[in-house]
């Protein structure tokens, strides 16, 4: 049948595409001073029409709609699908590199990769990196570093107890 090492990268890629969709929300809203959770649903940047769930499936919806809003017909930037694909690929790569057994380390890298994706794409578009992303990375590093010593190559403090 299927083994976990074969299935895990595909699951990570699918999860990465979903996370990438949320990262697009952050990339669009943070530099504009908008909340990332209000409005809760995604909307067309041109006509502000709320996007129904079936038009918000990562990568597939953009391709199916040919990169256009189904309401007003205005183009939806190719950046949206690029972010979803890049996030998907990077999540799968992290899983391939670390394996499916070390989930805390994997999740920590996913978080750090996500912060870097937001910083990169906001910087490319607006030539800024929002403080929320910078301080989020600092906070994540400070919290995760002692919790997951493998992030910085240190052995686990519990390793000698085994």
Predicted regions and their residues:
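N-terminal signal-anchor transmembrane alpha helix
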Residues: 7-32
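Short, strongly hydrophobic alpha-helical membrane anchors
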Residues: 1-5
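Transmembrane helix-loop junctions in multipass membrane proteins, especially transporters and channels
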Residues: 29-33, 37, 96-100, 150-153
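Membrane-proximal soluble regions of multi-pass membrane proteins
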Residues: 23-80
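Functional transmembrane core segments of multi-pass inner-membrane proteins
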Residues: 12, 101, 105-162
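Alpha-helical membrane-inserting segments
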Residues: 23, 27, 90, 94-98, ...
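P-loop/Walker A nucleotide phosphate-binding surfaces of NTP-dependent enzymes
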Residues: 8, 36, 58, 81, ...
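Membrane-interface loop-to-helix entry segments
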Residues: 20, 79-85, 129-133
């Amino acid at each position: 049948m299927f083994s976990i090492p074969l299935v895990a990268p595909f699951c990570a890629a699918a999860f990465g595409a979903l996370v990438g969709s949320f990262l697009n929300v952050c990339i669009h809203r943070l530099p504009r001073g908008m909340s990332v959770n209000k409005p809760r649903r995604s909307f067309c940047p041109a006509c502000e029409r709320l996007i129904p769930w079936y038009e918000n499936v990562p990568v597939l919806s953009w391709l199916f709609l040919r990169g256009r809003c189904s309401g007003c017909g205005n183009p939806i930037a190719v950046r949206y699908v690029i972010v979803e694909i890049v996030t998907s690929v990077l999540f799968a790569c992290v899983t391939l590199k670390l394996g499916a057994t070390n989930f805390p380390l994997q999740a920590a890298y996913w978080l750090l990769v996500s912060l870097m994706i937001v910083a990169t794409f906001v910087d490319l578009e607006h030539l800024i990196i929002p403080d929320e992303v910078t301080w989020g990375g600092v906070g994540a590093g400070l919290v995760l570093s002692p919790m997951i010593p493998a992030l910085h190559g240190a052995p686990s403090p519990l390793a000698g107890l085994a």
